[in-house]
Amino acid sequence: MAKKSLIYREKKRQKLEEKYHLIRRSSKKEISQIPSLSEKWKIHGKLQSPPRNSAPTRLHRRCFSTGRPRANYRDFGLSGHILREMVHACLLPGATRSSW
């Protein structure tokens, strides 16, 4: 189980990313449309003004059961070992059992 503080930190990053998503997207669109370099630098400065944690690259997928940040399956939202346990317990319909 991951520490609660790490899980809350990740949730805070998700909220920040949602808040600043439109600002980032609009300024990136402006940069691609403007031909002059000096104006691009000004818009680039605006792009750097939101907090670092609002960048989408700082987000990690976490297992919703344990909070583990590694070995996550996107389709299920689970880490590998929890996914295996749930498949063996027949809790995931349509998943076939396998041992590795």
UniProtKB/Swiss-Prot annotation:
Compartmental location: Plastid, Chloroplast
Main location: plastid
GO CC, one annotated term: small ribosomal subunit
Function: Binds 16S rRNA, required for the assembly of 30S particles.
Subunit structure: Part of the 30S ribosomal subunit.
Keywords tagged on the record: Chloroplast, Plastid, Ribonucleoprotein, Ribosomal protein, RNA-binding, rRNA-binding
Keyword Kinase: no
Lineage of origin: Eukaryota, Viridiplantae, Streptophyta, Embryophyta, Tracheophyta
SUPFAM superfamilies: Glucocorticoid receptor-like (DNA-binding domain)
Protein name: Small ribosomal subunit protein uS14c
UniProt keyword Transferase, yes or no: no
InterPro entries: Ribosomal_uS14, Ribosomal_uS14_bac/plastid, Ribosomal_uS14_CS
UniProt record similarity statement: Belongs to the universal ribosomal protein uS14 family.
Domain of life the protein comes from: Eukaryota
GO BP terms, alphabetized: translation
A molecular function GO annotation: structural constituent of ribosome
